[in-house]
Amino acid sequence: MGKKAIQFGGGNIGRGFVAEFLHESGYEVVFIDVVPQVIESLNKNKSYEVTEISEEGEKTKTITNYRALSSKTQEPEVVKEIATADVVTCAVGPNILKFIAPVIAKGIDAREEGLPPIAVIACENAINATDALRGYIEEHLDKSRLDTLPKRARFANSAIDRIVPTQPEHAGLNVRIEKFYEWAVEQTPFGEYGHPDISAIHWVDHLEPYIERKLFTVNTGHATAAYYGYKAGKKTIHEAMAEETIHKAVHAALDETASLIISKHEITEQEQKEYVKTIISRISNPYLEDVVERVGRAPLRKLSRKERFIGPAAQLAERGMKFDALLGSIEKALQFQNVKGDDESTELAKILSEKTAAEATQQITGLETDHPLYQPVLKVVEKVQSVSK
């Protein structure tokens, strides 16, 4: 029997990043989704194209050997597929992990003895997303068999990095995506079984440096460009980065996060400098045509405690280091309100208009009132509220 991977989420990241590399490593991919049109389209079309974009030009790959099931209407079939699969991956968004956990738990419980444990890897823009998914899965597992879980499933955190820009209107299943990618995954959880054979993955012993470097450089920089760009009326990230004041604001924020990364991890100043240079070049890429509203969407998640702004700024504040530029990013993110098609931006506007500055600061950022970052952020919230009212 050939290798089989279950991919929760048939969206652009699922099709254009995860499934691309699973396909290239010889896996049959079974997509699991809840959107009928996505499932129908995947089952009707026996192939789709992934076009990698770079300054050198474009390269198109054809993806085949996949199927799709609905976790909403075909749960028994999904459970059977998981019970006989080698790998489960997901790209559904951190807030959706708790909803996919019950069916994964049923699939793990249905695995026959003697099969090697299934590899579970969450591919989300969040720190330790697989740990979070595992927690939700364990809530739904047969409690009498929890002690045998390591024989049935192994869970590994990952750090993913690839920009998927706004897609052309009638792209269908085809995905346009940047050529650059990084997919780092912990190898230690697999122990004596060894990690699955996925050639695109960079297997590492310690993931935190990769996760923090990526989240606090790529995501911090990308979102800073989006929020400054939105406020300045720019259409794309490329247009935003072409304006000197925005370019400087992004660079300043990344200088601050770089100082944290260098002081905390075994990454040299020169290494991080080169990494920042690469990231700024990537997000400035004119060929990606990345719309600021897409990159800025979900501001409440992006302003949360462990995320790309508050996360590094809080650690810098704890160390007595500079975080002024990040406060500027936070201010612009707070101004991303009532954006069409983005529920979180509407909710953000509601919180800022209805709550006191102290209530809003705690609800949005999760900062403790005695934290050294709390007062500076409170002042930013007060400033944004005074302008909004």
From Swiss-Prot:
It is an enzyme of class 1 (oxidoreductase). It catalyses: D-mannitol 1-phosphate + NAD(+) = beta-D-fructose 6-phosphate + NADH + H(+). Its EC number is 1.1.1.17. Catalyzes the NAD(H)-dependent interconversion of D-fructose 6-phosphate and D-mannitol 1-phosphate in the mannitol metabolic pathway. Monomer. HAMAP family: Mannitol_dehydrog. This is Mannitol-1-phosphate 5-dehydrogenase. The lineage of its organism: Eukaryota, Fungi, Dikarya, Ascomycota, Pezizomycotina.
